[in-house]
Structure formats: C-alpha cells, structure tokens
Amino acid sequence: MSKILKIQYLKLYNVISCFLWMSVLLRTGLIWGITKDTAVVFHETNTLVRWVQTLAIAEVFHSIFGLVSSSPLTTIIQVASRLYLVWGVCYPFSYVIEGSPIYLSMIIAWSITEIIRYAFYAFNLNGDIPAFLTWLRYNTFLILYPIGAGSEFLLVLKSRIAAQYVWSLNKLLWPILMSIYPPGLYIMYTHMLAQRRKISKRAAARRT
C-alpha cells in the first residue's frame, strides 16, 4: 500500500469512527434527556454501540501490519476488553445490564474518549493538530479512563453474578479474565501516562 493511499485510508477510518461515536453520544444523551430511563437508553443504543465497537477490530490489523505505530499488544488489550463487554456481557446478559446506570456511565466515558481519540488521529494525519485537541487527548483520560474501566468492571461483576444461575462461557472464562483484566487496565493507563509525559516534555521544549 502506497504512503498516500495508507494516509487517506486511515483518515477516512478515523473520521468515520469519530462520527459514529458522536452518534452514540448524541443518541445516548437525547434518549436519556427525554426518558431519564436507563433501560430505554440501553435498548435504544445497545446494538449501535456493539457494532461501532466491533469496527475497532480493524485497529488490531492496523497495528499488526504496521499501518500505525501503535503497539499490537496495547491495541489487542483495548479492543478485546471492549469486545468482551459488548458481546460477552451486555449482549447475553441484557436483562441484568439494562436497568443499570453503570451502563450509561460506561457508554458516556467510551464515547467522549473515542470522539477525542479519533479526531486527534485524523488531525494528526493531516499534520495540524489543534492545541485544544492535544490537551483533551492527554488530560481527559485521567478522569474518563477510571470511569470507563470502573464501569466495565462493575458490569462484568453483574454478569458474573447472573451467570451463576445459567450455563455460560463466562463461568469458564471468569478466572482467566480476572487474572488478565487488572494488569491489562494497568498497562493501558500507564501507557497513556507515558504518552502524556512525552507530550508535556515536547511542549516544554518548544517553549524554551
């Protein structure tokens, strides 16, 4: 793939992904604003969120085949954990998840994070990142990541409780997932902290 074609493809991917997550956030906000009912929000957004998140599988291949500089390990951890949430928790255990405000907090945290991330990547490919977007990218995760990760963990816990009463693959996967999940979250958070320090050093160097 030529460099120009690669850049154009990645721009298109990031712009589309940004707008898809904007649609998730807008839909979530509108439905919650009208109904104030988390069950309605879940039923009206669950399918959209599931497929928008599934699209991120492409990012694993982007990293593996060198289209982007992201580490395949961190990309796989991030995408796999999200896919587990949408397909392994929210989909089969919708009857447990639908009334929980935790789902709402998770989707809001995910949406804002992804809108900022994809917009940042798109502008970066264009060679001109607005300063405010750089600030958002490397500061909002300090709040949004714990909210999102905490919500994810609580939803996984709710599904685990429900899985006790029915046969579920979650029963078999639970010990493995719980041994991988905490270190995976730690790796992702410390990776972002390292990126934040790197950007801060660059900004300080430009000012001197």
UniProtKB/Swiss-Prot annotation:
Residues 36-46, 98-102, 158-171 are lumenal. One of its GO terms (biological process) is very long-chain fatty acid biosynthetic process. Keywords: Endoplasmic reticulum, Fatty acid biosynthesis, Fatty acid metabolism, Lipid biosynthesis, Lipid metabolism, Lyase, Membrane, Transmembrane, Transmembrane helix. It catalyses: a very-long-chain (3R)-3-hydroxyacyl-CoA = a very-long-chain (2E)-enoyl-CoA + H2O. Its EC number is 4.2.1.134. The active site is at Y145, E152. This is Probable very-long-chain (3R)-3-hydroxyacyl-CoA dehydratase.
